[in-house]
Amino acid sequence: MAWRTNLACLIKAGGRRWFPVPEYSSLPPVLNNTCSVRKSTAPEKRVASVAACDTDGKEPGNPLDRLFSLEQQASILQVLNTASDKELEAFRLLRGRKSVNIVEHRKKFGPFQRLENLIDVPLIQYKTAVEVCNSILCPENRRRKKSQEKWLLRKFIKPGVEQERLKAVKSIVSIVFGTRRIAWAHLDRRPTVLDWQQTECWKLTNKTYPTSFYLEEISSVISKIPKADLYILEKSGLSIQNTSLLPILLHFLITEAMLYALLNKTFAEDGQHRVLSINRNAVGKHFDLMIGDTRTSGRELVKQFLSESVLKERPRVFFPQDLLVQYRQKVVKSSYRIEELYDSLLQAVAFYELVFGKDSELKC
């Protein structure tokens, strides 16, 4: 897409980055539900093992019990008859209502006697039943899924940090900056918004600011930012090939470098990164805010979060009751777009959901 940008117009529009950025490669396809076939001297067992790890070509006319050996059937039935609904949700295809239906079916009709009984459970059809049995027998697939999750974290969150360390954090500060403002959102793992602010720092013009100016301005901002285990910065991904955006790109790089240096106070001592960057478009994809290569405003989504915090027992984000009205007025009644403020909150929520999943509090 050809795109022409006038720097003066960008500044007049309020300083936020309304220009296309290259979309990162799409997520990898879901791994096929396959696993290796162990050699066996018993032909009937080898055939059953193949059936257990390959769902292709199965027809409803082929009863479930014929696809698995007696030993495999016993293993599957043991899980189906003893696991709680929460334990059953560990299997991807049984998340939500299906796991509850299995437990309710057990209570109403007694333990499952045959694998074929699984099809009698509401919402579970033949193909789903076969894949559920496969996933119970092939834990390797779950290990591959965990490996895929680690790959996603390495791809979108940099520099690389051990997953165990990411999952040990108690609070983060998400920071987003533009050509006029710096905004931050301080969230714990619930996630509850502990602090959410923005400050005017500069007006980017055609003149060049000395490095000392950046140091003074950003040091002043950092003095207001709360302490946290990790600081998450937005990585815009602007292309250097668009020469008209070079002044803005340079501004972003200087600001980012200053934040990395000033917030990583103990890096020289322990070598541990406490400042990470997350790709802007990855957050946009996480919340379905992308239209082509361009990320749209997150204002409506933030307003939805504010409403759900009052209306829902388990909202996606919790807001302190004493600050809820203040935040809502700031978002709803603002006469100009404060995109940095919206994006700092969305970035924090996306980080927690990428690391912990949507029910992060339950995994603490």
Curated annotation (Swiss-Prot):
Coarse class of the protein's main subcellular location: mitochondrion
Annotated GO MF terms: nucleic acid binding; transcription elongation factor activity
Gene Ontology CC, one term: mitochondrial nucleoid
Transit peptide: 1-39
Protein's UniProt keywords contain Transcription: yes
Gene3D superfamilies reported in the protein's UniProt record: Ribonuclease H-like superfamily/Ribonuclease H
Protein name: Transcription elongation factor, mitochondrial
Species this chain originates from: Mus musculus (Mouse)
